Amino acid sequence: MPPLTQDPQSVDARAVANLLLDKAAALDIPISNLALQKLLYFAHGRFLVDKGRPLVNGFFEAWKFGPVHPVVYRCFSANGPKYIINRAIKKDILSGLHIIVSPPRDQDIHEGIERVLLTMGRMSASQLVAVSHASGGPWDVIANGPGTNLGLGLRICDKVIKDRFRFQKVSVSVPPGLGDTLEEAPPS
C-alpha cells in the first residue's frame, strides 16, 4: 500500500499555508512561522481523520518544538520569530518569474482551515507547541519513541498522524519559561 502522502488529492503545502495566512489575516490573527507549522499540522491531522486523506503533500518531521513541514518552513524561515507578512512563492516554469503560490479552491480545505483557526488560531506559539507535544501523540511517538535516540528530524508519517491524532486533544498549559519568541531550527 503506498504512503498516504502520495495521495493525488493532497495539495501543495505552500498553497495551504498561504490560505491559512490569508484567512488568519482576515480574522486579524497574527501568525509566526512556528505557529504556522503547528496550525498546518493540526489542519493536516484533522483532515486525515475527517476525510481519510492527507491535506498537504510532502511530510512533517519531528523537530524540537513539534511537527514541521520542511518545505513550508524554508518558505518562511527568514521571518524568524516575527509574524509572517509574506506568502510562499514558486518559480513559474514558463515565464521563469517567481509568483505567489495560489491557495487551493477546495471548499473542504477552506472549511478545515477555518475550523483550525477558529479553535486554535489565537493560541500562543508556546501553547501550540504544548499541544503538539501531547503524550502519546504523533510527535511524541516519533521524537521520544523507544529506539529513536531523540528522533528529532525523523518523518512523522501520515499513518502515525492518523492513528495517534486523538491524543492531541489535551488541556493547554504553557511550560514555565516558554514565551512567544520561540523559533524553530532544523535538527542538527
From Swiss-Prot:
InterPro entries: SocA_Panacea
Keyword terms of this UniProt record: Toxin-antitoxin system
Coiled coil regions, renumbered to chain: none
Summary of the knockout phenotype: Essential, it cannot be deleted unless the downstream gene for cognate toxin socB is also deleted. In depletion experiments the half-life of SocB is 19 minutes in the absence of SocA and about 2 minutes in its presence.
Protein name as it appears in the record: Antitoxin SocA
Pfam families: SocA_Panacea
Keyword Zinc: no
UniProt induction comment: Induced by DNA damaging agent mitomycin C, part of the socA-socB operon.
Subunit structure: Interacts with cognate toxin SocB and with ClpX.
Function of the molecule: Antitoxin component of an atypical type II toxin-antitoxin (TA) system. Unlike most type II TA systems, neutralizes the toxic activity of cognate toxin SocB by acting as an adapter to promote its degradation by ClpXP; degradation is dependent on the N-terminus of ClpX.
Superkingdom of this protein's organism: Bacteria
Keyword Mitochondrion: no
